[in-house]
Amino acid sequence: MNKLRRLRSLSPEMAETLRLAGVQGIFWAAMAVGNYQTVYLQSIGFPATDFGLLNAIACAVAIFAMTFWGTVSDRIGSVRKIVILTLTLGCGLFIFVPLIPTGQSYSTLLFLILIPIINFFRVPMSPFVDNLTVRNCAEHRLNYGMVRSSGSLLFAVAGVITVNALIPAAGVPSTFWVMGIVMIPAIVLTYFCFEPQSGKRVKKSAAGAGVLLKNYAYM
């Protein structure tokens, strides 16, 4: 009961700091776990000559994805919703990569098609998580360094655990679905984070131009 009362007595700023630190920490822990796509592709015999093509397609998709999701975020006036959407779809689709058929004549083509589609949702995850964190820290005067350090710390911890425990015990394919599971708390915490005010749509005033023209200091 005492712990519950303490949590309820937290100021909105402190509560938001804890939420953002949780999002950053869990997000980067999940990213550390799911950082073995290239290792997996090599283990199944993905042609080395096609890695260059896959990377080229991934770069093109990254440029388009960032532009697309940035536009959508501006249109709907929400950064938080885009974070939730990209985390959910990016990780939800990523866990199915090990299920793509291997050893078939069409396997390479499937990877070249499906991985860029998955990356369309995965690439914006990190920029939008940082966007949400930076804006909320600025608007509510939170300590960004402390919030962001949780991500760096848990990234290192999760990386050590993955290399020394998860992969030896369950293999590289397990990193895909474990990443999805680890990311779930980050998605839930994001739902309860504040929506940055600067991310909301601002209704344009029809008299805006007239006001500027009458402002002699501006003219």
Regions from the language model: what does each represent?
Residues 88-105:
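C-terminal ends and interior cores of transmembrane alpha-helices
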Residues 64-78, 166-167:
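Helix-to-loop junctions at the C-terminal end of transmembrane segments
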Residues 158, 174-192:
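Symmetry-related core transmembrane helices of the 12-TM Major Facilitator Superfamily/SLC fold
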Residues 6-60, 217-219:
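Helix-loop boundary and gating motifs at the non-cytosolic
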Residues 25, 93, 105-127:
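Hydrophobic core of transmembrane alpha-helices in multi-pass small-molecule transporters
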Residues 115-150:
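Cytoplasmic helix-loop-helix junction between adjacent transmembrane helices
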Residues 1-14, 193-219:
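Juxtamembrane intracellular "pre-TM" segments in multi-pass secondary transporters
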Residues 74-88:
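Cytoplasmic membrane-interface "Motif A"-like loop-to-helix N-cap segments
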